Amino acid sequence: MKKLSSISTALGSFLLSVSFSLPTFANINVSDLTQKLPEGSNVGFIAKNINQNQIIADYNGSTFMLSASTQKVFTAVAAKLALDDQFQFETALLSNGKIQNGNLDGNLIVRFTGDPDLTRGQLYSLLAELKKQGIKKINGDLVLDTSVFSSHDRGLGWIWNDLTMCFNSPPAAANIDNNCFYAELDANKNPGEIVKINVPAQFPIQVFGQVYVADSNEAPYCQLDVVVHDNNRYQVKGCLARQYKPFGLSFAVQNTDAYAAEIIQRQLRQLGIEFNGKVLLPQKPQQGQLLAKHLSKPLPDLLKKMMKKSDNQIADSLFRAVAFNYYKRPASFQLGTLAVKSILQKQGIRFGNSILADGSGLSRHNLVAPKTMLSVLEYIAKNEDKLHLMETFPIAGVDGTISGRGGLISPPLVKNVIAKTGSLKGVYNLAGFMTNARGEKVAFVQFINGYSTGDLESKTKRAPLVQFERNLYNELYKY
């Protein structure tokens, strides 16, 4: 019995020494740090030491909140799993006719597949291939094949008053110059006079209105409103103070098919190719002999731009491209939701009652808990050797959307924190990684919703956020 007691005592001493040799993880007191934020702000935060497989902070980690552009993390992982790195968006010219004596006897089919980076210049170069093949006249119709996508070209829950803004341009199958154009306003007029609106000739768009220059008494109460009419016509209303230099306003294209068709016809004329047919917009995929094609940059390049610059067009184009490739049918935003969830759930990601309405995070319908986003970050960390996604995250103080993030641009956070941002009105989110003082990888998710500083000037309204993030991530670094 004495011998057994000695063994037991020795074993207890050994276990005690082992327990003291392991690192201890006291949860970061996020609650106290949130006192720096404006009253009424809602915060969800969760962090995990990846090396130690230990949650080191959890404050409202299970609460559903607006994910904003951190949603692009879901899109990036799903795209990596559903599409290979050689994936490229293809814009193609096809025909069901024959080329003879300088004539294309048949329809010209232009197949768009949602290339979010297609430019007017690239489209012109593509159409110029027809001229190189000796085509001088098209004896048929212009057929736009946009069948890769279906239903609306905007997600459910996109704010109506943002729909004319270029960051909200429809990520349609036919997407030229991000489906964005600009008009120039000359308001160097006397009070009461009408502002001159000029649309550059390359845009097949009409912008009109009765905007007037206001005097100094009325100017503080002025605002400009845009009303969208059919056939890509825009009416600008309101007033503004006198501006001594012309300035530009950017608008989102509303009817993307009509916009693309008009640009194609103009470019055919510029190339000296005669066309007098109709424009057809069939719902079904069109077949024909390939005449020429243009390819976008490959998937890794698209993802890097999407993540670094928070490019909404790329995100939502990939969102539906994933669905098209996954289900082999025309993709709506709703089908994109099903595809992304299905792909990630197969990797063990649990969405529960989460709502995913789009790939960009623009929708106010999106509801995600910090712990769900954290599970995707964990998946990235564990599979980075094949995903290569960490290199796409913005780097604090270096590039992307956190190059100037006030709370992260000083040591030890600068060049250390990598994170996808998420911003809507009242929303300041981060989802990413950092290396702590011991050299261990830490994944974190910060969701701040309902952030409002009332009437504070824009220069000072972020001061509480900067202080909160500086304190929080310095604490996280110590753990």
Curated annotation (Swiss-Prot):
Organism of derivation: Haemophilus influenzae (strain ATCC 51907 / DSM 11121 / KW20 / Rd)
Pfam families with a match to the protein in the record: Peptidase_S13
Superkingdom, taxonomy of origin: Bacteria
Pathway per the UniProt entry: Cell wall biogenesis; peptidoglycan biosynthesis
GO molecular function: serine-type carboxypeptidase activity; serine-type D-Ala-D-Ala carboxypeptidase activity
Annotated GO CC locations: periplasmic space
Keyword set, alphabetical order: Antibiotic resistance, Cell cycle, Cell division, Cell shape, Cell wall biogenesis/degradation, Hydrolase, Peptidoglycan synthesis, Periplasm, Signal
GO biological process, one term: cell division
Active site positions, chain numbering: S69 (acyl-ester intermediate), K72 (proton acceptor), S310
Subcellular localization: Periplasm
Positions of substrate binding: K420
Signal peptide: 1-26
InterPro entries registered for this protein in UniProt: Beta-lactam/transpept-like (IPR012338), Peptidase_S13 (IPR000667)
Family: Belongs to the peptidase S13 family.
Function of the protein: Not involved in transpeptidation but exclusively catalyzes a DD-carboxypeptidase and DD-endopeptidase reaction.
Key word Cell wall biogenesis/degradation present: yes
Catalysed reactions, semicolon-separated: Preferential cleavage: (Ac)2-L-Lys-D-Ala-|-D-Ala. Also transpeptidation of peptidyl-alanyl moieties that are N-acyl substituents of D-alanine
EC number: 3.4.16.4, 3.4.21.-
The keyword NADP is assigned to this record: no
Protein name (record): D-alanyl-D-alanine carboxypeptidase DacB
Major localization listed first in the record, in broad terms: periplasm
